[in-house]
Amino acid sequence: MVPKLFTSQICLLLLLGLLAVEGSLHVKPPQFTWAQWFETQHINMTSQQCTNAMQVINNYQRRCKNQNTFLLTTFANVVNVCGNPNMTCPSNKTRKNCHHSGSQVPLIHCNLTTPSPQNISNCRYAQTPANMFYIVACDNRDQRRDPPQYPVVPVHLDRII
């Protein structure tokens, strides 16, 4: 009985550790609203090269993000997608606040090729350009910190297809 109890406690601790790691990957820096963080991660590609553009995101998160997709469109265009019909989010079936882009957009997908946990400025990325549809989750804007011209804003890039 004791070995089973001990083993199950270890499994529970490992599972909780994995959940904590997974949950930490979806944390935004405190100075951003969810919409601002979406724009930083997925619209504002500060360089045409993934390695340089990802340094901005990695510096906020203090880690090398495994992958990221930049939509080569405007924030306003993505806000317009929030007006498309609601659908269940593919990555989280309990969320019903997703919207399909309806048309393909150019994008660049960045994939970590050289991790560097000790020095995030040494992380290197490969990039893949494409034209794809996307699904975005939208929520009401942060009343205190988001601009009032957009009552509903994108907060999560759920999927590219």
UniProtKB/Swiss-Prot annotation:
Gene3D superfamilies from the UniProt entry? Ribonuclease A-like domain
Q: List the disulfide bonds.
A: 50-110, 64-123, 82-138, 89-98
Q: Which reaction does it catalyse?
A: an [RNA] containing cytidine + H2O = an [RNA]-3'-cytidine-3'-phosphate + a 5'-hydroxy-ribonucleotide-3'-[RNA]; an [RNA] containing uridine + H2O = an [RNA]-3'-uridine-3'-phosphate + a 5'-hydroxy-ribonucleotide-3'-[RNA]
Keywords from the UniProt entry? Chemotaxis, Disulfide bond, Endonuclease, Glycoprotein, Hydrolase, Lyase, Lysosome, Nitration, Nuclease, Signal
The record ties this protein, via Pfam families, to: RnaseA (PF00074)
Q: Which residues carry this modification: 3'-nitrotyrosine?
A: 60
Q: In which tissues is it expressed?
A: Liver, lung, spleen, leukocytes and body fluids.
What's the protein name? Non-secretory ribonuclease
Where are the annotated glycans? 34, 44, 86, 92, 111, 119
Domain notes from UniProt: The N-terminal region is necessary for mediating chemotactic activity.
Instruction: Look up the signal peptide feature and give its range.
Output: 1-27
Assigned protein family: Belongs to the pancreatic ribonuclease family.
PTMs?
A particular signal processing and glycosylation pattern may differentiate the UpI2 RNase, found specifically in pregnant women urine, from other nonsecretory RNases.
One GO BP annotation here? innate immune response in mucosa
**A GO cellular component annotation in the UniProt record:** extracellular space
GO molecular function annotations of the record: lyase activity; nucleic acid binding; ribonuclease A activity; RNA nuclease activity
The entry's active site is 42, 156
Task: State its location(s).
Answer: Lysosome; Cytoplasmic granule
Cite the record's note on assembly: Interacts with and forms a tight 1:1 complex with RNH1. Dimerization of two such complexes may occur.
Using the UniProt record, give the first listed, main subcellular location: other
What is this protein's function per UniProt? Answer: This is a non-secretory ribonuclease. It is a pyrimidine specific nuclease with a slight preference for U. Cytotoxin and helminthotoxin. Selectively chemotactic for dendritic cells. Possesses a wide variety of biological activities.
Query: Where, in this chain's numbering, is substrate bound?
Result: 65-69
Write down the EC number.
Answer: 4.6.1.18
Broad enzyme group: lyase
| Alphabetized SMART domains for the sequence | RNAse_Pc
